[in-house]
Regions:
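Alpha-helix C-terminal capping segments
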Residues: 9-21, 128-135, 220-228
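Glycine-rich phosphate/pyrophosphate-binding loop at beta-loop-alpha junctions
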Residues: 92-177, 240-253
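A short, small-residue-rich loop immediately preceding and capping a beta-strand
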Residues: 1-12, 18-27, 111-120, 143
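Active-site-proximal loop->helix
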Residues: 9-56, 150-162
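Small/polar-residue-rich loop-to-helix segments that shape phosphate-bearing ligand pockets
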Residues: 29-107, 178-191, 196-197
């Protein structure tokens, strides 16, 4: 993933718990990062992960992961290659498994709106598969933070369908997904409105919102309210506390 990827840190933590070695292929060059590396990478390194800076763009990482796995096999090891963001049907199951908890919290609120940030598409795909399995009727808005919405939509729906098949649940329909294009100035780059909303969440509710996913999803929520949405809105917080702390530290400096 990228240096600010939530998945980079999560993968390192999971590997440590499972007693697995973890090689993380990171886009970009280490020399171009600030002296204090993003906390996401610091957390991953602190968990014992091997950080491999590729010098490549994010879009090239999946191919590089496969090449790295081939080299490990040639050394007699048994790698389990995972694409960026954990975007596989198995990777999406985590979000699908979380839907029943949300359903319990939203009992009686069938008209609720759920807003989920998405990068690789795995989280949103899992949510859609879990929503279908639960028979929920909430309207779902995905907020695409890294890829143009028309491009990522088909990938999300295909991944959701494959995840639904693993659950032996009903199919995910195209109409189940409303997708907001929030790439803006780029992945992890915020508009002035996004920055204001980060501060608003912190000052009014004490909520840390990261710059990569949460800030853009929060902007989408406030846009819905401004457009007249009156149903209960749930913002699914995508994590990213290390990146949020990095952003706040930079603002303080």
């Amino acid at each position: 993933g990228s240096p600010s990827s939530n998945f980079v840190a999560a993968a390192a933590l999971a590997a440590r718990v499972c007693g697995l070695d973890c090689d993380l292929l990171v886009s970009g060059n280490r020399a171009l990062l600030p002296a204090d590396v993003p906390l996401t990478l610091g957390l991953a390194g602190g968990c014992g992960a091997n950080l491999c800076f590729t010098g490549a763009d994010r879009e090239e990482l999946d191919g590089l992961v496969d090449e790295h796995a081939d080299r490990l096999r040639a050394e007699g090891r048994r790698p389990y290659p995972v694409p960026r963001g954990g975007a596989t049907p198995v990777g999406a199951l985590g979000f699908a498994a979380a839907v029943p908890e949300l359903a319990a919290q939203l009992a009686g609120l069938d008209d609720a709106v759920v807003v989920v940030p998405t990068g690789s598409g795995a989280s949103l795909a899992g949510f859609l598969a879990g929503r279908a399995a639960a028979g929920a009727t909430w309207r779902t808005y995905g907020v695409s933070v890294s890829r143009p919405a028309p491009r990522i939509r088909a990938e999300i729906l295909a991944l959701a369908g494959r995840c639904a098949a693993l659950l032996h649940g009903p199919a995910v329909r195209d109409a189940d997904l409303n997708l907001v294009d929030a790439v803006g100035p780029g992945f992890g780059r915020l508009t002035d409105a996004d920055l204001r909303h980060v501060r608003l969440a912190l000052d009014s509710e004490g909520i840390l919102v990261d710059p990569t996913y949460g800030a853009k999803a929060l902007t989408a929520v406030l846009d819905l309210v401004a457009a007249g949405e009156r149903a209960p809105i749930v913002l699914w917080h995508g994590g990213g506390v290390p990146a949020a702390l990095t952003l706040l530290a930079g603002g303080a400096a």
